Amino acid sequence: MNQSFVFNYGKLVASNLDSDALRLVRADKGLLIWVNLFAPTPEEATSILEDVFSFHPLAIEDCLAVSRYPKIEDYEDYLYLVMHAVAFNKEDQFRTTELDLFIGKSFLVTHHSEPLASVTSTIERIQKNPSSIARGMDRLAHFLLDTMVDAYQPVLNDLTNEIGALEDTVFLSREPEPTVIREFRERKKELSDLQQIVRPQRDVANRLARGEFKLIRPVLLPYFRDLLGNLNRIETTAATLHDQLYMTLDVFLNKASYETNEVIKVLTLLTAVTTPTLLIGTWYGMNLKMPEYEMKYAYPIAIAIDLVTTIGMVVWLKRKRWL
């Protein structure tokens, strides 16, 4: 499916045009066009990307393929960007969605395979008040990216709450659930995925903010610097959460190790205390005739030796403060 919006001096003058109409609009340099491709068929993608806009084959190939890492490429007449939105789905699973952008002087083409809240909110903004963001394709692209980055905050809040709950489980529970390690692994993967896309996105924003590309007007540079600042803050928060997660993991492992050592200590002490009795029982349990068996008080003496050695072992362990 594709949506198209045509602007003239900040006003929305047409929408949802077919490929032939878009070619005619492209010929009028006074009009601005935004085409949004949402999960297009191969025919729709080819019609727009190749036939209408004549983008470079390598850029089209990258656009239609899945890319894990954000990037920006300059094709002189337009910029090609790969960015990623993040969210939690209905099953509370962290996921990322790729957004491809072709930014030209008079056009913006976006492509994504899944619904994006930033695109939806931008379309709603255009339909209500297009003049605020539709006076330039660089401004429209910034609004899209800024809205997308703003959506990172709820994800960070969810991750913060999940790691906080994990901390409570580790610090407050006498015996943490066996699922703790699985929770650690899932949170670690989510944070790693987030950091893998935030770092290169920050680099993309940095290049946009420092005026490297002629298609980004100087008046927009402060806005892209603000976008860069937001990404820096997100990266810092993600790094802090990553450290917090590993600190909690260290506490959990130390706690588990301590509890294991306590169990081993108890078993070792039991073994030490009962060793004299076991030795005596083993010695006199041999199937041999011993002179002691003929003694009148052999049995009471054996019991007494057992008790004395056991009590002596307990006293010795207490003096060593091992018990």
Q: Model-predicted segments: where are they?
A:
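Peripheral, non-transmembrane regulatory/ligand-interaction domains of membrane transport proteins
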Residues: 1-219, 223-240, 292, 322-323
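Hydrophobic alpha-helical transmembrane segments and their immediately adjacent juxtamembrane loops
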Residues: 229-323
